[in-house]
Amino acid sequence: MRKTILTAALLCAFLGTQAQEYYEKHVAFPAGATTEQKIDMASRLVPTPQQLAWQQMEFTCFLHFGINTFTGREWGDGKEDPAIFNPTELDCEQWVRALKEGGFKMAIITAKHHDGFCLWPTRTTKHSVASSPWKNGKGDVVQELRKACDKYGLKFGVYLSPWDRNAECYGQGEAYNKFFIEQLTELLTNYGEVHEVWFDGANGEGPNGKKQEYDWDAILKTIRRLQPKAVTAIMGDDVRWVGNEGGLGRTTEWSATALMPNSYPGSDEVYKRLGINAMSKDLGSRELVSKASDLFWYPSEVDVSIRPGWFYHAEQDNQVRSLANLVNIYYRSVGCNSVLLLNIPPDKRGLMHENDVKRIKELTEYIKKTFADNKVEKGNRIWTAKVGDTKEYKVRKNTLVNTFLIQEDITKGQRVEGFTVEVFANGAWHHVGEGTTV
C-alpha cells in the first residue's frame, strides 16, 4: 500500500469555528501591535472578488502587437510613419482559437505601447490605425480582438503605456493626464467588459527625457467607475510585477505582502524604510511583517515572452522557447502562487506564427496529461488544518506519482508557511518533497 502524508505549518492556529474578522485587500496595523498580533491580522487579509477571480485564471496571454511589429524594434520612438502598419491577413480569431485550445483564460493586447501608436481609432491622436492603410484607415484591432474573445469565451484585457513618446503633451503634467485618461476612457467604454488593465512601469525619463507626474488617483478612479470588475496591474493596485521577465516566481511568494502599490502616495518612503522593492526576495516573511505598518493583498503576475523579444521578429522564428523551458516556467509561476502571463507576439501578417502555435499546443498537452488523472483518493477535498497537523491520503494501487498539487483556499487568507510530503512505501515513510507558500 502506498500512502501520502501532508504536514502543514500555518500562520496562525486560530482556525477553529469562532467568527473571524477579515480584511479585504489592505490592513493597517494598530500602533504598538506585537509581532504575533500582526501575524494574526496578516492571516486574515483576503483578496477582493476581482483579485480572487484573477488569481483563479492562472494562465493568461500577452499580445505585443503594434507599430514595432513592422519596424523591428522593441521600443519605438513615436516618430514612426503609420503607413507602415498594414497587417493584411490580420485574424484575431486565429489568435484566440489558439489561446483557447492552449488553455489560456484571457488575452491582453498592447493597445498602445511606448511609441504612442494606438491600435484603435482614437480621437486623441493621429498616431493610430486610422492613419494607416490597413482597411483604408477603418480598422480597429482592439475591437476585432474583443469580438474574438467573446466568440471563443476568453476574457479580455488592455495594456496602455503611460509613457508616450509621441504625445506632444507628455511631460506637461495635467495636460497629459487628461490626454491619457481620455484614451483610457475610450478603451473602457467602447469595448465591452475589460478584466485587466495593465500599466507598464517602463519609461525613459531622465536627463534627456521628459518628467511626467501621473495622476494615479484619477486614473484608478476612472477604472473603478467604468470597469469595476477589472483588476489593475503593475502600476495599478491589484496585481504586482513579479520582479523579473524570466518567467520565474519566488519559491516563497506571498500575496499578503508589505509591498505597497507603487501608485500609492508614500510608497517610496515605505520601500526605503523596509528595504524592499518589487524585485526583493522577501516580501512577506514574519520578520518583514513585524516591521511593517500595513499589509496589502497584492498578488504576483509573471510576464515572460515565448521568444527572446516581446514583439515579433522574423529572425527569432527558430528561437521559440523549448517545451522543457516552458514547463519549467509554468511550475515556477503558476506553481509558485503567481499568474503566468505568457507573451505570444503576432507577426507582420497579423497572425500567430506557426512555430508559436505548435509550441503552446505541446505545452497544453503536457499540462493536461500531467493533471488530468488525480491518483489520490479524495484528494480534492478541502482540509482545514491547524499548526503541525498531518493528513494521510491513499494513492490508487499500481500508479506512479511524480507531481504533487496543493492549493489553498485564499478566501480565508494566505496562511500556509510550509508543508512537507512523505510517501509510505515498502514499510517505511520517505520524505519526497517540501515547500513554503502555496
Which ranges hold each PLM region?
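Bacterial Sec-dependent N-terminal signal peptides
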Residues: 1-21
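Mature catalytic domains of secreted/periplasmic carbohydrate-active enzymes
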Residues: 20-437
